[in-house]
């Protein structure tokens, strides 16, 4: 690519934002080695070896270091490594990689997910990350979690799919869900979603994008960020 085209591309808002986040990660680093030193190395090795030849899609998570590196970036992008202690709720927490890093940075953490993959339960125990077992469903509120949160996050989850059809929630389902999440946020709390793409490659319909924006979100491709809470 010619230099002029590279410069032009970097001046595009999306490219600039993503480049700035990468630069911030390199400046404000989060070492993983001290965190890894706190967990049972023999247990890590045993889990990895046991799933090494598994053909199950989830078996990839038994090799924990790539997923810790990915979730370190998520923590850095939300600036949780530069924040005073917060209460963090992660929806669809899986094996707890994101919350493990957040907890090691001094935050109080809680995950919500269904109990359908034994590996995830093993990893949560390894990381000492607490989880509430709960299936998130359309038009159903979350349970009483005993506290309100400064942050509610969700990364690459599938709770907004109807099963088994895989049909995605529409604006009515999402609006109910956002209204319910507001009940679990402290005043001024933040919500971040990292969405999976549709089969078309888009992340949401135009109507859903408009809903997110109307409720106060900054929308950047898969990133839906309610930095100042929700507007109803």
Q: Where do the protein language model's features map onto the residues?
A:
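Conserved class I S-adenosyl-L-methionine
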Residues: 85-94
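Conserved alpha-helix/loop element of class I SAM-dependent methyltransferases that forms part
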Residues: 65-85
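Conserved beta-strand signature within the Rossmann-like core of class I S-adenosyl-L-methionine
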Residues: 188-195
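A short acidic, Gly/Pro-enriched loop at the edge of an enzyme's catalytic core
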Residues: 142-152
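Conserved SAM-binding loop of SAM-dependent methyltransferases across substrates and taxa
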Residues: 95-105
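A short SAM/SAH-binding and catalytic strip from SAM-dependent methyltransferases
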Residues: 151-171
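A short glycine-rich, Lys/Arg-flanked "PGG" loop and its adjoining helix->strand segment in the class I
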Residues: 168-187
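Conserved SAM-binding strand-loop segment of SAM-dependent methyltransferases
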Residues: 128-138
């Amino acid at each position: 690519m010619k230099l002029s085209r590279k410069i032009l591309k970097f001046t595009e808002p999306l490219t600039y934002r993503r480049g700035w986040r990468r630069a911030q990660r390199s400046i404000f680093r989060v070492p993983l080695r001290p965190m890894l030193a706190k967990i049972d190395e023999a247990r890590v090795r045993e889990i990895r070896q046991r799933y090494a030849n598994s053909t199950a899609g989830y078996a990839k998570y038994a090799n924990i270091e790539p997923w810790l590196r990915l979730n370190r970036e998520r923590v850095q992008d939300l600036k949780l490594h530069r924040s005073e202690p917060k209460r963090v709720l992660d929806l669809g927490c899986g094996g707890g990689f994101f919350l493990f890093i957040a907890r090691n940075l001094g935050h109080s953490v809680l995950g919500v997910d269904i109990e359908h993959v034994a590996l995830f339960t093993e990893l949560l125990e390894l990381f000492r990350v607490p989880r509430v077992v709960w299936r998130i469903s359309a038009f159903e509120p979350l349970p009483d979690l005993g506290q309100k949160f400064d942050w509610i996050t969700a990364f690459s989850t599938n709770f907004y799919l109807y099963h088994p059809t895989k049909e995605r929630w529409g604006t009515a389902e999402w609006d109910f869900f956002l209204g319910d999440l507001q009940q679990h946020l402290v005043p001024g709390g933040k919500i971040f979603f990292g969405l999976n793409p549709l089969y078309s490659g888009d992340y949401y319909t135009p109507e859903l994008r408009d809903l997110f924006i109307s409720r106060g979100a900054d929308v950047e491709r898969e990133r839906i960020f309610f930095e100042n809470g929700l507007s109803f």
